[in-house]
Swiss-Prot record:
Its EC number is 4.6.1.17. The keyword Lyase applies. Keywords: Lyase, Molybdenum cofactor biosynthesis. It catalyses: (8S)-3',8-cyclo-7,8-dihydroguanosine 5'-triphosphate = cyclic pyranopterin phosphate + diphosphate. This is Cyclic pyranopterin monophosphate synthase. Homohexamer; trimer of dimers. One of its GO terms (molecular function) is cyclic pyranopterin monophosphate synthase activity. NCBIfam families: moaC (TIGR00581), PRK09364.1 (NF006870). Catalyzes the conversion of (8S)-3',8-cyclo-7,8-dihydroguanosine 5'-triphosphate to cyclic pyranopterin monophosphate (cPMP). The gene is moaC.
Length: 158
C-alpha cells in the first residue's frame, strides 16, 4: 500500500512539497447526486423555486467551490485553474439532480480535490435553495470518476 503523503516521519501533518515535480496538464472529473421528493424535482425543473434559478446558481457555486478548495481543505495547494466545467442532469426517474464537474490546470499537483469540492458545493447549493420544501434531500454517490496527468498517470473509475 502506498504511503500517506500528508504526514512527515514524526506523523505530523504537512503540506506536500511539489516544487520538484514537473508541470503537466492535470484533469479530474467528479460526480455526485442529490435525491429529492418528486415535488421538489418539479420546482427545480420548472424553475419555480422561491429562491430563483436553482441550477444556474448551483453552477456558479460549484465553480466557486473549485476555486476556493485550498481555503477549505487545509493541506491542498492553491492552484491556478484553467477550466471548471459544471454539468447538471435532471433525472425524474429517481427523482434527482446529478452534478458532473471537470477541472483542469497545468501544474505540479492534481485537481481531484477541486473537482470533488465543486460537486459538493454545487449539490449543497441545491439543498440550500430547496430545503424549505424538502429537508429530506440526500446528497450521495460523490466520487472521482477519472483523473489524467502527473506521475501516477491516468485513472478511470470502474
Amino acid at each position: 500500500m502506498p504511503e500517506l503523503t500528508h504526514f512527515d516521519a514524526a506523523g505530523q501533518a504537512h503540506m506536500v512539497d511539489v516544487g520538484g515535480k514537473a508541470e503537466t496538464k492535470r484533469i479530474a472529473v467528479a460526480r455526485g447526486t442529490i435525491r429529492m421528493l418528486p415535488a421538489t424535482f418539479e420546482l427545480i425543473r420548472k424553475g419555480e423555486a422561491k429562491k430563483g434559478d436553482v441550477i444556474g446558481i448551483a453552477r456558479i457555486a460549484a465553480i466557486q467551490g473549485a476555486k476556493r478548495t485550498a481555503d477549505l481543505i487545509p493541506l491542498c495547494h492553491p492552484l491556478a485553474l484553467t477550466r471548471v466545467a459544471v454539468d447538471f442532469e435532471l433525472d425524474e426517474t429517481v427523482p434527482a439532480v446529478h452534478c458532473r464537474v471537470q477541472v483542469e490546470t497545468h501544474g505540479r499537483t492534481g485537481v481531484e480535490m477541486e473537482a470533488l469540492t465543486a460537486v459538493q458545493v454545487g449539490l449543497l447549493t441545491v439543498y440550500d435553495m430547496c430545503k424549505a420544501v424538502d429537508r429530506g434531500m440526500t446528497i450521495t454517490d460523490v466520487k472521482v470518476m477519472e483523473k489524467h496527468g502527473g506521475k501516477s498517470g491516468d485513472w478511470v473509475a470502474e
